[in-house]
Amino acid sequence: MSDGKAISTHETRRRILHAGTELFRRSGYTGTGMKQIAQAAGAPFGSIYHFFPGGKAQLGEEVIRTSGAVYLGLISALMTPYEDRVAATADAFAAAAGTLAEVDFADPCPIATVAMEVASTDETLRQATSEVFDSWIDHLAAYYAEGGVPGSAARETASSVVALLEGAFMLGRAARSAEPVRAAGTAAAAIVRAALAGA
């Protein structure tokens, strides 16, 4: 395969993955058809099955894992510069509230959208979403532990923060308001503050 053809092939696959991510985020996994993905990607319909022979389920799993890694990078970039874990948490939620408004209250997190739809019907996708959430919690637990939260409390704190964020996104979408995310940020910062005080 020539270099040009390899680049073109890689680009087509990237476009399909990106289109799947955006459509799953906006319309959900079950509400998105493969023809829609091909059209949004500007790719021949058959090329989806060339790159993802497992079909929609394989594409869905890759969207979950790829998006999970991207969001973990965003979390890290937002919070790592802060030594103050309380301020880091509050500012991360403030940024999330801004993002929710920017995307016009569509779900900014495709992982949560897919998880809610398929958790009881597709074990592969359920496992993928669970592993992504665990990776976020592990990362945050390490971050809070490094900031002084005892190891036994760090994971519980991280789990609470992730749960607050994901729940707030859902409430924000329903209300078409960023206020639930801001309120959750206040609660999350208080949880981190209390965990540090108990150190």
What does each model-found stretch correspond to?
Residues 90-142:
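Short secondary-structure transition hinges
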Residues 99, 120, 142, 162-180, ...:
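Amphipathic C-terminal alpha-helical segment
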Residues 2, 15, 19-62:
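Helix-turn-helix
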Residues 121-123, 133-158, 195-199:
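Hydrophobic alpha-helical bundle segments that form small-molecule/ligand-binding pockets
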Residues 87, 127-128, 146-162, 179, ...:
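All-alpha amphipathic helical-bundle segments outside canonical DNA-binding/catalytic cores
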Residues 1-11, 198-199:
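N-terminal intrinsically disordered/low-complexity leader segments
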